């Protein structure tokens, strides 16, 4: 009864259990400030819960458009960025998608789920994008997925390499989920390149992973096409209200981002050569320590394939980071971890 395609998938799993420190999901360690939550709750008291939300999430789209200085017709909102990814795989004509491993696994997941072949163009040894090689494989592609900063390596991709791919005029989804942590974005290129889709989220910098709010910036033609196939009412009133209020307090988000970046750089200095440079809210660490950390009550992300023997570590609160660093010193030996 169940399709063979579905049987070929494994459920997405995370480590469950009562662990004292969780640094595995790239979450923001800081919750929304209480006053921001109260503002959301106050607005929700005036909303009718018995009515469906706006069919195309226009209140949230207008708030995001005002924030960027674009038209709401350039904005689409999803129940998390994953929802938008699932549609973007189906939106365009072409024979395959292109991904650049090691990268975010959901690109290939949604492609395979929709029966779309996946073509891989590995990142260079330093994890940078090979724009020329990607452009070659982009011919007849439905869409090219590029994450910048990349997950799980953490590095920002060179603008000139991304532009090489955009010049093919094939659809390019630039996933900027972590852009706030580096302060650089290519969203303004949507005017010059109608084939560009910039994907963003409220889960990371804004600390709203539990709300499930993602959005994209693109040309009107792409946004219009997406809403032709997007499930109606998928973005609820809670999500839309939280988006509007959070954007009014973007200055608080920026303060939180600065704290996380400071901690990230402190951790990187302490880890020395074990840690790769990062432009995101996590670090890629060259250390086969997943099980040993788990024994100490610390959950990180175990990596495989090309990154076998590496872990990805979310930047947490200072005490969490200190506990992680102390554990690494015990596991790797003091000489491998500088400054501890």
Swiss-Prot record:
One of its GO terms (biological process) is L-histidine biosynthetic process. Its EC number is 2.6.1.9. It catalyses: L-histidinol phosphate + 2-oxoglutarate = 3-(imidazol-4-yl)-2-oxopropyl phosphate + L-glutamate. It holds the Pfam family Aminotran_1_2. GO terms for molecular function: histidinol-phosphate transaminase activity; pyridoxal phosphate binding. Keywords: Amino-acid biosynthesis, Aminotransferase, Histidine biosynthesis, Pyridoxal phosphate, Transferase. Pathway: Amino-acid biosynthesis; L-histidine biosynthesis; L-histidine from 5-phospho-alpha-D-ribose 1-diphosphate: step 7/9. The modification N6-(pyridoxal phosphate)lysine is found at residue 204. Its cofactor is pyridoxal 5'-phosphate. NCBIfam families: hisC. Belongs to the class-II pyridoxal-phosphate-dependent aminotransferase family. Histidinol-phosphate aminotransferase subfamily. This is Histidinol-phosphate aminotransferase. It comes from Thermococcus gammatolerans (strain DSM 15229 / JCM 11827 / EJ3).
